[in-house]
Amino acid sequence: FFKQKTAYEIKECDWSSDVCSSDLTNEDFATVCDNLHKEGIQVVLDGVFNHVGRGFWAFRDVLEKKWDSPYKDWFHISFDGNSNYNDGLWYEGWEGNYDLVKLNLRNEDVIQHIFAAIKGWVEEFDIDGLRLDVAYCLDHDFLRRLRSFCDSLKPDFFLVGETLHGDYNQWMNDSMLHSVTNYECYKGLYSSFNSMNMFEINHSLLRQFGPDNWTLYKGRHLLCFVDNHDVTRIASILTNEKHLPLIYGLLFGMPGIPCVYYGSEWGAKARKEEGDPALRACFLEPEWNDLSDIISRLAEIKKNSEALNYGSFRSVLLTNRQCIFERKSEHERIYVAINADENSFHADFDAGCGTAQELITDTPHDFGGGTDLPGYSVAVWKMEH
């Protein structure tokens, strides 16, 4: 909801206090948040605390006053150099992008300015959390202070960070972030279908959540997705559109918090090389279809399942084109089955019971004599006790 000159010229206004739009007021946004809360929807804002645009008021003051600016230590600046814009000073930009001026997150005034903004958002809009842009760049001490501060505002305040590679535990732990983006499984999800190699995503899931003691993120809840605002939409990246319902079946069945990018619930298409406007298109109204129905049902199943939210992960059956895995909690056991092939597949495996309820279709299922998985199918079985 911030007013922007370009896709990257962010935070031109006083983002600590005002919704920056010519059409939307703070009162309007407070009403939006209130109505969302009444529908049981929590509001998580995008917090960009690593950098600001060149038009940010404090940086403009530095450009004007140089050494005499009280904000010169808000940024990583050298007055012995020069910038690409011939500013008469050098500054650090985010990953070499000098349209985005990196904030000094070890400066107490910067920290307090950010904290005051968050406090204002909680008090005025009652927000429920923050998604931290480029969290992998943020100072770890800052993240610890941010977690402590947000906990003091709201005990259940949610912090999720954008991370790409490496050990996610360095950001996701009891003193920093609650969750991070699971880019490892993002790649494994679409690649497993395009290469018809279910071993890839299964390997990642076992590495992250499997039954062995050494697995990386057991008990953690990573933000999982098949597309977002930075990557090609899943309907464009999959080589077989019949795999669309199946990949969402995997997304909602695997450990983690499933995230559906707006428009993708009906199969909107866009490629990264087409640029941000294509990836972040405006839709006049939803285009509800069969895919939307399946995703809606999967979301309902996930919401109401103890095992899918908190259960362990175990691989039951695995081939190049089929996989079955178990999610198990104290009171519930769920099997998720995927057949990515066009042909039916006969699966023989130990179900540990005789019957189950298939939750997508809400029909009983008998495991006697094995199970036939139709071509291009996903099943979610709630196993009998």
Predicted feature descriptions by range:
Residues 1-20:
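Single conserved hydrophobic/aromatic residue that forms the stacking wall/gate
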Residues 16-124, 146-152, 169-170:
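Substrate-binding/active-site clefts of carbohydrate-active enzymes
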Residues 33, 37, 51, 63, ...:
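Active-site-proximal helices and loops of the catalytic beta/alpha 8
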Residues 43-45, 130, 159-161, 181, ...:
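Hydrophobic faces of well-ordered beta-strands that scaffold small-molecule active sites
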